[in-house]
Structures are given as structure tokens and as C-alpha cells.
Amino acid sequence: RPEYEPALRKYQERRDELNQKYTDQQQTKQPSEKQSKNWVSVTEINQLIDELTLETKQYKGYAKLSPKELNVFQDRFMLIFWLSYPVRNDLHTTRVITRRAFNALPREQKETQNFIIGGKPAIEFSIGNYKTRKKYGVKKIRVDDKVVLAAMRQWLSVSPNPDYILVNVKNGEPMSSLNITQALT
């Protein structure tokens, strides 16, 4: 209706102005003031990893670990992994599997699930379950950082379900994307 045209134009101009402001901010790759308040520095993450490392040393030789103690091992692994391989929540429901077992899987399973593939020539992270998989295909990441591999081995040696890389330590079920987000906050 013609009587609404001026209001509609004003709204569209304001919308376009705000969209441009948002685009300009995104182009700078700088966090907003609000984001900066919630930002955690790499130094702070490394300090937390050091604290968790000291805690894991205290539990060495324990026959049975409580869920709280298991979380220390898993949290340490997650932080170390994500510092070297920033893959957001792509570790959700990731199975740990040998290369031979992976090669024997049907193609569809390889392309729709996530795996940590052990064995020669190197450990590999295969990501087949992620939002833009149809566009980019399965991502494969070679895991060759010695600190990450040591943390992974340590975590899997105490994990209640070493068939999955991240689990709910109380029941051994694989972690979902939501569980990972909750664990990191």
C-alpha cells in the first residue's frame, strides 16, 4: 500500500546500514568489544593445560578413576588437540579405529561418520560428519603432533570407552556436539 512506502524505505535503509556495519566489522577479523570480554587467550589455555597435566600426574597408578578424575584427562586432551587442530566440534561421535578396520568399512560409512584412524603411515582424523560435507567432501587431517598423540594415548588408556575419542565419562556414551560445547564452557 502506498501509505506504507515511506516507512518501508526508511526500514530498508536502516537494515542496509546495519548490514554494512556488520560486514565491515567481520572484514576486520577483530572481535567485538562483547566478544573480547569472553575471549580466552592461548596463554590462558596453556596455563590450564599445565594445571591439568599436574593433576593427571597425581592420578598415575590409580586402579580406578572417578568421573571427575577422568574428566581431567579428557579435558586436557581436548584442549591440547584443539590448540593444534582447531576443528570446532567435529570430534563429536568420533570413533577410534585401526586403518585395516577403516578400509573394510562401506564407503557410505566412511563418508558420513568421523574417525581417528590409527596405524601406519600416521594417525589420521577423517571428518565425514559435518555441516558442509556435501560441498567440501570428507576432510582428512594427519595427526602428527607428538604432544597431541601423547595426550590422546594417555586419555584412551583410561577412557571408559576407548572406541570413541570423546565420551561422557559417567556412562561411556560418545559425546555429541552439544556435550562438547558444554564441556568447553
Regions from the language model: what does each represent?
Residues 1-2, 71-75, 81-109:
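A short, glycine-centered helix-capping/turn motif at helix boundaries
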Residues 94-146:
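Conserved tyrosine-mediated DNA breakage-rejoining catalytic core shared by Y-recombinases
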Residues 3-63, 170:
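Flexible interdomain linker/hinge and immediately adjacent N-terminus
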Residues 14-16, 84-87, 130-133:
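Short, solvent-exposed loop/turn segments at secondary-structure junctions
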Residues 1-13, 143-144, 180, 184:
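Non-catalytic DNA-binding core/recognition domains of DNA-processing enzymes
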Residues 85, 95, 128, 167-169:
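Short His-Asn-centered micro-motif
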Residues 134, 140-185:
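Active-site/catalytic core of tyrosine-dependent DNA strand-transfer enzymes
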Residues 42-90:
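Basic, Lys/Arg- and aromatic-enriched nucleic-acid-binding interface segment
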